[in-house]
Regions:
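Intrinsically disordered, low-complexity terminal regions
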Residues: 1-175
Length: 175
């Protein structure tokens, strides 16, 4: 494993297996890292994929998609690309202009999602209590979660803040 990697590329892809601290910048290439401690990844039009994020990751793309398998802390911004998080245990701040944002399984923490015209979908893990603060101006909003009152002591809790202008919002239990 590398303790630190600083990589810049105009159009080539960046592929790393395991790195402690990462700084990766490409114009049109993709960034792919299997395991990262802390990192920053930026692309103009390339995609970003991260497997396990042990500490935190900050991503920014113009038109590329961002996919993160598992994370504790994530800050991700995309102009027209989609942002996908498979599993969240911690804090995430997701921003898209026209891309969709999807969190497949949110277990605990604080999730703040904003999209102008993209859709927002969040799957909440079974057994996780949720505090919802969601709104859309002209999109449709749907939550399949039941109201259960205050969380039990020791129960996993997720605070979800989600906003769209014209995108749809869907909150459901993770499959």
């Amino acid at each position: 494993p590398l303790s630190r990697a600083v990589v810049r590329s105009g159009s080539g892809d960046i592929h790393l297996v395991e790195v402690g601290d990462l700084e990766a910048v490409t114009g049109s290439g993709d960034v792919r890292v299997t395991t990262v401690g802390r990192g920053r990844a930026q692309t103009g039009s390339g995609d970003i994929w991260a497997g396990a994020v042990r500490d935190s990751l900050v991503t920014r793309t113009g038109s590329g998609d961002v996919t993160v398998a598992s994370t504790g802390r994530l800050q991700s911004t995309s102009g027209s690309g989609d942002i996908t998080v498979d599993e969240l245990h911690g804090q995430a701040r997701l921003r898209t202009a026209s891309g969709d944002a999807h969190v497949a399984r949110a277990v605990s923490g604080h999730l703040d999602v904003k999209s102008t015209s993209g859709d927002v979908r969040v799957g909440v893990a079974q057994g996780t209590a949720v505090l919802l603060d969601c709104s859309t101006v002209s999109g449709q909003m749907r939550s399949a979660l039941r109201s259960t009152g205050e969380p039990e002591p020791g129960e996993e809790t997720l605070e979800l803040v989600a906003r769209t202008i014209s995108g749809n919002l869907l909150v459901d239990r993770a499959g």
